[in-house]
């Protein structure tokens, strides 16, 4: 019999892990549940010259990161068995984060021809004009069309499942294989 350990996801159910995963005792209050911090700025030293402003773990200002955001990211990572997670203020912000993380000038992306309007605009207006990133729009449920759209500089395949409004469903597992074999991400 396995003894439940709230710090080990292999020993507890999903619901228990959703409650306990990613939690740590709060150093300031001793709370065993992550407190909600109602702050948008944090105390800085009198001489801020030693601050590493690019350190994503350092609590400086909530537009960069905050205690609540870090707690949510830790919980999501724990629930998914990942090393880390990132949360964004909106879906479009998340798309920007993914695309700018994996694409650079001269790269190519394959994008579902049925895409959220903001995704479409990113790949038809902003990314090609300002960053030199090209995109080919294809029916991502048609694996042969996806394979035909591959280029040596393809770095990303983006699909939406279930595509709205067509309700078209792409085969995620097959697309992941195509992307992996091409040295791209899905």
Predicted regions and their residues:
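Buried hydrophobic positions in well-ordered alpha/beta secondary-structure cores of metabolic enzymes
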Residues: 30, 76, 94, 109, ...
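Conserved PLP-anchoring active-site segment centered on the Schiff-base-forming lysine
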Residues: 101-119, 138-139
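Short, small-residue-enriched loops and turns at beta-alpha junctions
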Residues: 116-117, 143-145, 162-168
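N-terminal "arm"/small-domain region of PLP-dependent enzymes with the aminotransferase-like
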Residues: 2-66, 74
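A glycine-rich helix N-cap at a beta->alpha junction
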Residues: 126-141
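Short helix-loop-beta connector
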Residues: 79-83, 103-106, 152
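Conserved N-terminal alpha-helix of the aminotransferase class I/II PLP-enzyme fold
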Residues: 41-96, 118-126
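Catalytic PLP-binding core of fold-type I/II PLP enzymes
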Residues: 151, 156, 169-186
């Amino acid at each position: 019999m396995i003894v439940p350990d709230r710090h080990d996801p292999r020993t507890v159910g999903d619901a228990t892990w959703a409650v306990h995963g990613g939690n740590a005792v709060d150093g300031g209050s001793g709370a065993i549940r992550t407190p909600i911090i109602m702050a948008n700025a944090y105390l800085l030293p009198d001489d801020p010259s030693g601050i590493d402003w690019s350190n994503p773990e350092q609590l400086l200002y909530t537009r960069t990161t905050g205690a609540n955001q870090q707690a949510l990211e830790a919980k999501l990572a724990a629930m998914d068995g990942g090393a880390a997670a990132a949360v964004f203020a909106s879906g479009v912000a998340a798309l920007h984060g993914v695309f700018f993380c994996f694409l650079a000038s001269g790269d190519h992306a394959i994008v579902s021809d049925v895409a959220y309007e903001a995704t479409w605009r990113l790949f038809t207006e902003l990314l090609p004009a300002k960053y030199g990133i090209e995109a080919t729009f294809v029916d991502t449920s048609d694996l042969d069309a996806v394979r035909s759209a591959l280029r040596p500089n393809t770095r990303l395949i983006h699909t939406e499942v279930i595509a709205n409004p067509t309700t078209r469903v792409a085969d995620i597992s097959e697309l992941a294989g195509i992307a992996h074999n091409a040295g791209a991400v899905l």
